Amino acid sequence: MASGDIATVANAELDLPYGSALTSSGRISAVTEPGELSVHYPFPTMDLVVLDDALKYGSRAAKARFAVYIGPLGADTAATAREILANVPTPENAVLLAVSPDQRAIEVVYGADVKGRGIESAAPLGVSAAAASFKEGNLIDGLISAVRVMSAGVSPA
């Protein structure tokens, strides 16, 4: 490209379903009609079942609620993660793993009742486990690994 040229991107015609659009970041965004349920899930059902099991059994073992958030975290990722934690049932006894793939951010926040039970050392290990899988392109595997590592490191109350 020479100085002053305008960069253009070739836009191949995509056969997108009704209500779908290609965003500037290259992702496909889709909506459904009001009152209809979406049948297009971002992850295979079996992956969601395994994640649900990790959350359920991890929460039971640690006697603390584990939760996962995937989405944008804004400019202050830690503050946004704390806001999301406040909306989790029993936020004082909860651990939230918040991941923003577009920002390449991973945050772990937890309530006051979990503090001092091992989460301080388990959280960095969970983030490391997640990041290793994320680098390989495995979002769900990273979430599952992080939840398992962190829940194993938190002692029951």
Curated annotation (Swiss-Prot):
Keyword Ubl conjugation listed? The answer is yes
Q: Which UniProt keywords apply?
A: Isopeptide bond, Ubl conjugation
Where do we see the Isoglutamyl lysine isopeptide (Lys-Gln) (interchain with Q-Cter in protein Pup) cross-link in this protein?
K115
Q: Does the keyword Zinc-finger apply?
A: no
InterPro entries recorded: DUF5130
Q: What is this protein called?
A: Uncharacterized protein MSMEG_4692/MSMEI_4575
Please give the organism: Mycolicibacterium smegmatis (strain ATCC 700084 / mc(2)155) (Mycobacterium smegmatis)
Lineage here is: Bacteria, Bacillati, Actinomycetota, Actinomycetes, Mycobacteriales
